[in-house]
From Swiss-Prot:
Membrane-spanning ranges: 36-56, 61-81, 107-127, 130-150, 158-178, 186-206, 243-263, 284-304
Catalytic activity: heme b + (2E,6E)-farnesyl diphosphate + H2O = Fe(II)-heme o + diphosphate
Protein family (similarity comment): Belongs to the UbiA prenyltransferase family. Protoheme IX farnesyltransferase subfamily.
Pathway in which the depicted protein is active: Porphyrin-containing compound metabolism; heme O biosynthesis; heme O from protoheme: step 1/1
Organism: Synechococcus sp. (strain WH7803)
Entry keywords, A to Z: Cell inner membrane, Cell membrane, Heme biosynthesis, Membrane, Transferase, Transmembrane, Transmembrane helix
Keyword Metal-binding part of the UniProt annotation: no
Gene3D superfamilies: UbiA prenyltransferase (1.10.357.140)
EC number: 2.5.1.141
Protein name, per record: Protoheme IX farnesyltransferase
GO biological process, one term: heme O biosynthetic process
Entry membrane topology: Multi-pass membrane protein
Note: Carbon 2 of the heme B porphyrin ring is defined according to the Fischer nomenclature.
Amino acid sequence: MASSSATAVPLTREQVVPSRQRIKLPAWLEVAKPRLIPLLLATTLGGMALTEGWPLSSPRLVCTLGGGALAAAAAGVLNCLWEQELDGRMQRTSGRALPSGRLSPTAAFAGAVSCALAAATLLVSGVNCLAAGLSLLGLCSYVLLYTALLKPRTTQNIVIGGVAGAIPPLVGAAAATGHVGLGGWWLFALVMVWTPAHFWALALLLRDDYRAVGIPMLPVVKGPVVTARAIRRYGWATVLLSFLGVWALPEGGLLYGLLLLPFNGRLLQMVERLGAEPDSTERAKGLFRWSILYLFGICLLLVFSRQSGAAVFDLQLRGWLAALPAGLPGINA
């Protein structure tokens, strides 16, 4: 097969994300996992755009995103603290800040507590208590539910534990209106079903690492064929659920739906290719990278569809579509 050469050597995380090779972060910043934060903030913005409270005032927007970034940083540090012994046993992760000794656990814990307190203060004082509480829930679910409880015990760890990454849209909705409406819950559900396909693509690439330390990721326990089938199911579920954004948006939904088509087409193409070649590292790597761009794109479309010009265009498009049947031969015959 054409992809046989791609299956010989499993890729490292650094090969999957080349920026890890180019950018060396200070130890105190490395443990905060800053590369994960932009996507969390993007889904927070998406949650805001799905409410009648959009756009937010600049101070509230800054406080929400700043608080969310600090809460995510605290969660990242606590995750590194919990897994430092595990990281030290794997060649790929043994050079990280905590297992290598470049940062002490005491300093890391102090940083995590400081970030969590700063996040809570910023969100309570600058946004509202619901947004602060949801951010704290996201932090706890990542560290306790996913990292400590589910990750070492079940192949479905990311399916259930994915709730941690799905909470930012709820934070965004709460920040905009003081409550979480149907739009926020829709984006929460979308991120939940997007997460397994995204993460299992990465786990296919790193399954030897997970196997070496006894972490029961799906590719380790069930193999690449079963994993590719599961990815396909969740990929299709993501596509189908994404179209509900047409109705979840207060305005601009039709424009969102039209612009969504190429994103979904590409996602389906990549999950089907992986299904045809489940052992291909290149297929898994491509899907992992595209899945990140896909979720960024969804959130960008949500925000774009709420701009005034986009809303006007959406109304014009709806009028044109409503008038279209009258111009078709035989419709009024």
